[in-house]
Amino acid sequence: MDVFSFVKIPKLSSHRTKSSGWPPPSGTWGLNQVPPYGWEMMTNRDGRDYFINHMTQAIPFDDPRFDSCQIIPPAPRKVEMRRDPVLGFGFVAGSEKPVVVRSVTPGGPSEGKLIPGDQIVMINDEAVSAAPRERVIDLVRSCKESILLTVIQPYPSPKSAFISAAKKARLKSNPVKVRFSEEVIINGQVSETVKDNSLLFMPNVLKVYLENGQTKSFRFDCSTSIKDVILTLQEKLSIKGIEHFSLMLEQRIEGAGTKLLLLHEQETLTQVTQRPSSHKMRCLFRISFVPKDPIDLLRRDPVAFEYLYVQSCNDVVQERFGPELKYDIALRLAALQMYIATVTTKQTQKISLKYIEKEWGLETFLPSAVLQSMKEKNIKKALSHLVKANQNLVPPGKKLSALQAKVHYLKFLSDLRLYGGRVFKATLVQAEKRSEVTLLVGPRYGISHVINTKTNLVALLADFSHVNRIEMFTEEESLVRVELHVLDVKPITLLMESSDAMNLACLTAGYYRLLVDSRRSIFNMANKKNAGTQDTGSENKGKHNLLGPDWNCMPQMTTFIGEGEQEAQITYIDSKQKTVEMTDSTLCPKEHRHLYIDNSYSSDELNQPLTQPGDAPCEADYRSLAQRSLLTLSGPDTLKKAQESPRGAKVSFIFGDLALDDGMSPPTIGYERMLEENPEMLEKQRNLYISSANDMKNLDLTPDTDSIQFVANSVYANIGDVKNFEAPEGIEEPLLHDICYAENTDDAEDEDEVSCEEDLVVGEMNQPAILDLSGSSDDIIDLTTLPPPEGDDNEDDFLLRSLNMAIAAPPPGFRDSSDEEDTQSQATSFHEDKEQGSSLQNEEIPVSLIDAVPTSAEGKCEKGLDPAVVSTLEALEALSEEQQKSENSGVAILRAYSPESSSDSGNETNSSEMTEGSELAAAQKQSESLSRMFLATHEGYHPLAEEQTEFPTSKAPSVGLPPKSSHGLAARPATDLPPKVVPSKQILHSDHMEMEPETMETKSVTDYFSKLHMGSVAYSCTSKRKSKLPEGEGKSPLSGNIPGKKQQGTKIAEIEEDTKGKAGTVSSRDNPHLSTFNLERTAFRKDSQRWYVASDGGVVEKSGMEAPAMKVFPRGPGLGNREAEGKEDGTVEGGADDASVLGQGDRFLTDMACVASAKDLDNPEDTDSPSCDHATKLSEAEDNVARLCDYHLAKRMSSLQSEGHFSLQSSQGSSVDTGCGPGSSSSACATPVESPLCPSMGKHMIPDASGKGGRYISPEERAPGHPNHGATFEELHPQTEGMCPRMTVPALHTAINADPLFGTLRDGCHRLPKIKETTV
């Protein structure tokens, strides 16, 4: 016999549908045969019958079919007993409350009077039901002769004779639990009716699904409202910011995914559950009104913040953001979610993709469309790079906590236009004209009109603070007329579908309460009792006949049309409405019915001043309560600027036929496409998300995309045929002629790299409590016994004023990428905000700097320059202007020297780190970066890092050596936010390099580098850098086994002859991917700088120079090879002056330093550098000036004819192939090839076609003899044609282990471009 089996119950299942359920067919429900409705009888293994009450989830043994079985508790009994001298009172009491008689002693005074299990409620005349056990014992012992007990026998049970009272007490405290399944499976199949009916857990019990996978059930009656459920959930989940939450209905539409319907808090649960097709709906508890700043929500309510994160993860995986969520963003979010999941569960910072895939699977973190259309190996490759790049979100030396990662996750998502917003299709009614419009409603956009879906051009219709009330009227069949009353002007009238109208009204009202006034609702559901009585008549026939398939119920309707001949009683008039007569609803010519009429609006609130946080893009012009609307274009970066408030100006309306200014030329705004090598993959990506069945029918799939299953689940853009924002086929919609747009000349933003430089202090906060749900996940909460909710009128006016000032910013302005004035003005204003440590002579000129190495020295800078230095700079500036073409712009390659010195046993050594702007790319889109400033000191020019620069105060020592200082790389994010100082040891290695989403379809990282940087040109130099190597470290030539001295001796003459007199034009292709790629990979990044190169052969304007990263290593105390031979190493380098010349406007002169030897005069090879020898004979002031001038003269001739170029590896400081580690004992670092600090390594770059491309070998590979696993420079850097040969200063090559000319060799600093060279 089975453990559980059905007995005494006639089969009620339908064999045709293979389903069973309640209620049974009429005529077969006999009250005397089976249990009542909601009960089920079972039998246990002992054959005893018990019953399951599905309404209360109770399991009693009592038979509910008979009233006699409802046991009435026995009446209390009074028992008087006399103490026996031997047996006492003859019973044993337990320790429960109330005290229970455990056993009765046979032959004692209590035999026949007390029954085991009796509860002692009184002793003599004292109640002891709640008294402790010790008190009961004392009372019994105090009775010397007799005792009077008042006992009561609890409910009898069939098992009373078989179990003790103590065990019975334990069973009562821990009752038997039965897991109630959500679906009934018959013959291995789930019936459709049971599977789809998930809105009601059972009759009058609503099931609410939470985002964390749990469910809550609520019993309701006809008066239970949505607000009752929300307040109960607020109490159970310990939520403070309940204003962000709402209940929604998720409707599953065949062939069109799902659709979310907002529910008004005044609607009753009875109305919700009586909707047609309710068996295809689920009730969700969601954050529908997202905060503008997730950090603010974290401070106010950690539980709501955690809920928002879980909900956002579900929305990403379930593709609820539609096509707006690009592959790169989806992969970035997945990497963050993987990191959070691993840190939360394993308590480790090390992320393993294998562990993640085994434990959760990639489908837990990525949308199915990404998994289906991308190769698995490319997905894993991208995720591995992105997971490692997550550490770049925090300052170096700090660990990224799970809480910080969640904040960045939500910040990435907040850049999406549909995050917290919705798109609606509507018909604008203006007098007799009707035009189709697309509306965007969200916290940052207010109520905006999407003018062009291709260029994402939107215009602000109304801010939430301007909406007085919302009214809705039935129009024809499922159409509803929505009237938005804005200020005191004519209301905006829209015709919409009923479900969309309800979502628009609820979304607007919800954001109004969140951002403007939490005490007032601009969209109320009128009560039926306030409208008077009105008999149903024939005039109502057909007007509210809402069909099942197309019917989307208006939640605010108090009554609904029934089936058959039933009529609905439709009256929705608020008693506070002053202008509506009670008879209008029946005498209206078009038989319109007022569905929602708001209460009257007080004139005091209308006259409240509207705050304007931030700078208004356009000036408010009040003319008869009419203003100009802000015309703007949405972009990811402008969203950040407009995050504080959805409006930047007071907006009103001019209702006339005024067209949009034709002068607007929207730029191309969109996300960077991925999978470039596969054209058909672009078509896959474009058609990944389909919002209606018609789109699927019209989709022309390529053979490669036939197997892709498209998911139409874009619930935010829930309009079926609405065009996507980025849809290439987007068309310009009819303009709203009743609004006058003002032209705005803001620059366009096209940077989709999200800010990751937040220096969060939230890491020190306590971790938010995880959603703690009391009881089981399916416990039923009886809302019928809840007290009425209290009003929230006790809030003071200060909260209202503060909320009014915190209204979201206007739609982000449209910024023209060709506008340079805005960028310069921003740079100027940025400089004015800086704390000035010294007065600059050219303070008004915005100075662009590739890299800045702030020093740790504190204090104020020297006030002025040496007059000799000033005169020299002016002479060099004049020289630069003579060589500059008047009609062209040049590239200013500014090199910032960071002095660093160390003392070793009295031998003072000096080395200079130089960073060189060496990479040209078309990063015009990132024109928002701010310029750097130079501060003049006696050592030269030091770059002023934005907001974090410390000015060195050290003076030049007697030998002209700068003081030792520590350096760091300033990490420049991809936005205009202040950068952070990154310590020098934090250099991006190839293993930790982030991979852009565009590379997902490339075959390897090197192929992607090659593709990105094809044709990019950078200037390089072949000057040497002094370095030390530990004793005994083996060194070998870069290529072949030929010693460096031999190469030097045989090549000098050839090189000089081959390089003299050759000049050409250097050109490159602008690569749109270079900027965003470098922004994530370099330790220091400048968003976009305009560089101008001056050349005799031709001048080409380039923009978007990315700053190279530089790694600075302090000089080691150990002696190098030269010290071992007894020679002093005290090289003085002119680069220590850090000289930089400020040209006129944006033209700057390239700064370089000549390398001189001050002490190694015994080296005969030093005589080959006349300029450096001359510099050592001058005085201290003249020495610096002379060396600077001589070097510039030589460098000017060399740079005009330079040929070599290098790309990503050079600019990033050997982040790919040098292998410079933070703990490296050698001085290997990322110095550009033509830096004077970089040795030739036995090679010289010449434009001879007979040579072969060189390959770089890192010191880690040379020492143990392992082969180089990195790609060769020829593979990484294809060279464009027309490269200019270079006339160099005599390049003197030295042997690797011999005395170098200008300093010891430096490992890991030599990266060769792809050029031809001659070797011996």
From Swiss-Prot:
Biased composition (Low complexity): 900-913, 1223-1232
InterPro entries cross-referenced by the UniProt entry: Band_41_domain, FAK1-like_FERM_C, FERM/acyl-CoA-bd_prot_sf, FERM_2, FERM_central, FERM_domain, FRMPD1/3/4_FERM_C, PDZ
Region annotation Disordered: where it falls in the sequence: 809-847, 897-927, 949-981, 1024-1050, 1114-1139, 1204-1274
GO biological process terms held by the UniProt record: positive regulation of synapse structural plasticity
Biased composition (Polar residues): 1204-1217
Domain WW: 33-66
Recorded GO MF terms: lipid binding
Domain FERM intervals: 204-519
Keywords for this protein: Cell projection, Lipid-binding, Synapse
Alphabetical list of SMART domains matching this protein: B41 (SM00295), PDZ (SM00228)
Tissues/organs with expression: Expressed in various regions of the brain, including cortex, hippocampus, cerebellum, olfactory bulb and medial habenular nucleus.
Function: Positive regulator of dendritic spine morphogenesis and density. Required for the maintenance of excitatory synaptic transmission. Binds phosphatidylinositol 4,5-bisphosphate.
Assembly notes: Interacts (via C-terminus) with DLG1, DLG2, DLG3 and DLG4/PSD95. Interacts (via N-terminus) with ARHGEF7; the interaction is mediated by the PDZ domain. Interacts with GPSM2 (via TPR repeat region).
Comment block on domains: The FERM domain mediates the interaction with phosphatidylinositol 4,5-bisphosphate.
Protein's UniProt name: FERM and PDZ domain-containing protein 4
Native species: Mus musculus
